[in-house]
């Protein structure tokens, strides 16, 4: 993890696409280390969902950087000129789609149904789908995905999706 961060700081953050994947892998590393440190088994589902969600958010954030660069000429990142909005919209759409499908597969997997003793977990997919679509709207229409934390704290629709997901 430390070597990956050093490589990222020195060179990899300058490489388009690689930079975003490194960020997502970093979240997976933290998840694995946390699981190991606490003695909690980390399922392949949580690893996959963590990676995909981090990738989705990182691409959305990069898109915000691109829009800022195109509007002001200010580079938030060195590699911002290696991306464009059309490419980012495609990448975000692909990752969002894969994330949703993966989550639905998770909710209907035998392992998860048995673990939670419920055949109705798939209902939570409604809130995941709505939340991701709303985040796409915030990213593409509102152009306000520069800070995922700020979106989470301020967007009532996304907050309601999270509450609905937790309740179901």
Model-identified regions with their sequence ranges:
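Internal transmembrane alpha-helices of multipass membrane proteins
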Residues: 1-8
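C-terminal membrane-associated helical module and adjoining short loops/tails
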Residues: 10-15, 21, 28-168
């Amino acid at each position: 993890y430390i070597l990956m961060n050093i490589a990222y700081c020195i060179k990899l953050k300058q490489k388009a696409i690689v930079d975003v994947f490194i960020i997502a892998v970093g979240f997976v590393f933290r998840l694995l280390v946390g699981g190991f440190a606490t003695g909690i088994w980390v399922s392949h589902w949580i690893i996959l969902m963590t990676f995909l969600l981090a990738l989705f958010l990182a691409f959305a954030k990069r898109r915000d950087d691109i829009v800022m660069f195109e509007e002001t000429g200010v580079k938030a990142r060195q590699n911002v000129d290696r991306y464009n909005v059309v490419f980012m919209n495609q990448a975000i759409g692909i990752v969002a789609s894969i994330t949703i499908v993966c989550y639905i597969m998770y909710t209907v997997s035998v392992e998860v149904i048995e673990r939670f003793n419920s055949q109705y977990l798939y209902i939570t997919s409604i809130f995941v789908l709505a939340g991701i679509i709303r985040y796409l709207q915030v990213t593409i229409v509102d152009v306000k995905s520069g800070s995922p934390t700020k979106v989470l704290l301020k967007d009532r629709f996304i907050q309601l999706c999270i509450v609905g997901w937790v309740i179901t």
